[in-house]
């Protein structure tokens, strides 16, 4: 079985590179070697990111089914919606985006710059909604689908993070297949993999991919949702479904989902002092940009784990960089005095 049975529409450049983060590793004491899997530069479509990889397995259904409009949802600074909008433009499809008010952040430019600006540039129909943050299928999303159907359109639903779609986890099983090949080229295996998680399908796909070789407990998910119980339950559900799809013989349980909840505070989309410090440190040592919503918090978690010797000395750690830097301009107030 495996991934070969599923159609895949090419939207990425191919296997994403793994780069050594030597200066960051040295700055943190040199006891652990840090590497990055660069999903942040995986495509030429509106800066790419992890959702592009997932969409490669969803888009064949949209094309084969004759759908004319991609419909997706996220927060105002959603990476997901920006990537869906770019894919729609690339394919010549219409696109409707529901941008809910998930983040309690007051800035007059928040809904004008960053991801949402890029979505408008690629001609998506961007609709602001006052609903607050949660995971799962949202009423505003259902309403948009019903409205478009009544108007004679054929909308293709792409839920937040692609995570509620049955194929949402497949893309990151493919990411792990790339990692296995890259480990052979590098001549070593990674001891730990660190990845951000909110809606869960990136993390879930990596768990399933690593479970193919019994290494799923080496994956650390850094929660950025601030709703860790819901996130963990969703990750497990997606992982179990994805495992069945690819024919994984092992049954995954809650013990296979390792989520670190210490870095999501104070809320989804709001960085803490450690998040900003992590963004600056990663940028200053490596020239690699992370964002205040997702990757800044997972980078914060990685830095904390290394600094506090929570990862064994001599380990090689792979940080999965999921993208998200376009959101930085929406949070410029955090960096104005740097």
Swiss-Prot record:
InterPro entries: ACCD_DCysDesulf, ACP_carboxylate_deaminase, TrpB-like_PALP, TrpB-like_PALP_sf. GO terms for cellular component: cytosol; nucleus. Pfam families: PALP. The keyword Hydrolase applies. It is an enzyme of class 3 (hydrolase). Its EC number is 3.5.99.7. GO terms for molecular function: 1-aminocyclopropane-1-carboxylate deaminase activity; D-cysteine desulfhydrase activity; pyridoxal phosphate binding. The active site is at residue 78. GO terms for biological process: amine catabolic process; cellular detoxification. Catalyzes a cyclopropane ring-opening reaction, the irreversible conversion of 1-aminocyclopropane-1-carboxylate (ACC) to ammonia and alpha-ketobutyrate. Belongs to the ACC deaminase/D-cysteine desulfhydrase family. This is Probable 1-aminocyclopropane-1-carboxylate deaminase. It comes from Schizosaccharomyces pombe (strain 972 / ATCC 24843) (Fission yeast).
